[in-house]
Amino acid sequence: MDAHPDCGACAPKLHSWYDSDRFEYAGAAGGRIDRWGYPFCRGRRLSRTEEDHGQYDTPADVFWATGACLMTRSVLWRRLGGLDSRFFAHMEEIDYCWKLQLDGYKVCCVPQSVVYHLGGGTLPKTSPWKLKLNFRNGLLLLENNLARTFAAQGEPPRKALRHANRVIFWRKCLDGCSAAVYLLSGRKDFFKAVLEAHREARNLVSRPDIEALACQAKTSGVAGRYGGSIILASLLKGKRVFDYIESKMVL
């Protein structure tokens, strides 16, 4: 951090406590995000994690750094208000890292450091509440930051807001498809969790207004955004997905 004043936050590689040679779901080798706001990681595609063979041992700018072990500058933490309390337990570090980038700072993965993480300690993967938080907070993430990102890239405020609204609409449609799959497969508790997530998100949303977008500082880009769908890319490219995605990153 001392050697790189433009770095606002950094994190190590995250390995599984149970399988020490394998990346851990909550951060792996640094986080990315796709066009629709679905987060993923280098070393993690969908729910599958890779073994660490040194394939991500070069320090890299990433979109988000894991909240399991995050170092950030105290002055930036105070200025940005820390973690958004509306998120609770899921994706709040992604929201914070996105704000850091919009403030002109980088987020980095430092693979020379490795931390072993006990995943699922707060909520198990099978919890409908966990699923609800993931879907709800995914929408909050986009509402908080997407219009600001388009404004930072030079779009006029009203155009940036319309652009963000279109993306969020399609994200909601994709969530609806997931809900339908849960219902048809008999997982009614998961189906209800998605519906509840969208209902809660509507009540929690606080969008930036036109004046705030007009004041948004322009940036050279937000690192770690993939312009396509991580779900589609993973299905089509399999184990080669990260080589493909790295060539398609948008700034």
Predicted segments, located by residue:
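Generic structural signal for small/hydrophobic residues in well-ordered secondary structure
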Residues: 10-12, 37, 73, 77, ...
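Short helix-loop capping/hinge motifs at secondary-structure junctions, enriched
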Residues: 50, 76-79, 147-149
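Active-site-adjacent helix/loop segment of glycosyltransferases
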Residues: 103-210, 221-222
